[in-house]
Curated annotation (Swiss-Prot):
Subunit: Part of the 50S ribosomal subunit; part of the 5S rRNA/L5/L18/L25 subcomplex. Contacts the 5S rRNA. Binds to the 5S rRNA independently of L5 and L18.
Disulfide bonds: none
Residue spans crossing the bilayer: none
Originating species: Polaromonas naphthalenivorans (strain CJ2)
A Pfam family it matches: Ribosomal_TL5_C
Keywords tagged on the record: Ribonucleoprotein, Ribosomal protein, RNA-binding, rRNA-binding
UniProt family annotation: Belongs to the bacterial ribosomal protein bL25 family. CTC subfamily.
Keyword RNA-binding set for record: yes
InterPro entries tied to this protein: Rbsml_bL25/Gln-tRNA_synth_N, Ribosomal_bL25/Gln-tRNA_synth, Ribosomal_bL25_b-dom, Ribosomal_bL25_C, Ribosomal_bL25_long, Ribosomal_bL25_short, Ribosomal_L25_dom, Ribosomal_uL5_bac-type
Source taxon at top rank: Bacteria
Gene Ontology molecular function: any one: structural constituent of ribosome
Listed name of the protein: Large ribosomal subunit protein bL25
Function: This is one of the proteins that binds to the 5S RNA in the ribosome where it forms part of the central protuberance.
Length: 218
């Protein structure tokens, strides 16, 4: 995925605010052996780009000053309530340097699993992306996970996922987060309290005389 960036000379809160007013988003490119570069990107183009899954987990081709740079999105700061990107960070990609990146997870087969089809269970996607470690050339666009074998009482953890070659899950020590949980659906039974009738009240109603009819007008 490609995008165009421009070098910017000024930095600081005031300069960034003025830049946003003109429809530009300030950013930075860092990493590798080169010095960090301050950049600016057209906000409209950036706003459309961030809506695409590939912009968040794939190697991006950034055109800067007529030169193409391979980068990864590292941070995205949004305005608290406006539809505005306040600042964006990219990291340079070096072919021989192993990287840690977040990759989206695509689930399938859930509706055909015994857990859903016959065991009346609720399947919850606890994590929808996975942090992996690999070389830039091996970064997958997404990780496919088949949930067709899920059964009642069985959860799927990060270390259960079969990853592509040369790609490893980036988890620390014995940590093994749950990716998918399976919970039995418990149907709540609402008990209706029986209506208690007072015998005396019922007898009184039965013996009550009907109301007298009004006299006819002459």
């Amino acid at each position: 995925m490609k995008f165009v960036a421009f070098e910017r000379a000024k930095q600081g809160t005031g300069a960034s605010r003025r830049l946003r007013i003109t429809g530009r988003t300030p950013g930075i490119v860092y990493g590798g052996t080169a010095e960090p570069i301050l950049i600016e990107i057209d906000h409209n183009a950036l706003w459309h780009a961030i809506k695409k899954e590939a912009f968040h987990g794939s190697i991006l081709e950034m055109e800067l000053g007529g030169t193409e740079h391979k980068v990864l999105l590292r941070d995205l700061q949004m305005h608290p309530y406006k539809q505005q990107v306040q600042h964006i960070d990219f990291q340079r990609v070096e072919a021989r340097t192993r990287m840690t990146v977040k990759v989206p997870v695509h689930f399938s087969g859930e509706e055909e699993s015994p857990a859903v089809k016959t065991e009346n269970c609720l399947v919850t996607h606890v994590l929808t992306e996975m942090t992996v470690s690999c070389f830039p050339a091996d970064i997958p666009d997404f990780i496919a996970v088949d949930l067709g074998g899920l059964t009642k009482g069985k959860s799927l953890h990060v270390k259960d996922i079969v990853l592509p070659k040369r790609v490893k899950a980036a988890v620390k020590g014995q940590v093994n987060p749950v990716m998918v949980s399976v919970t039995p659906i418990v149907e709540e039974v609402v008990e209706v309290a029986p209506v208690v009738v007072d015998p005396k009240a019922a007898k009184g109603k039965a013996g009550a005389k009907p109301a007298a009819k009004p006299a006819a007008k002459k």
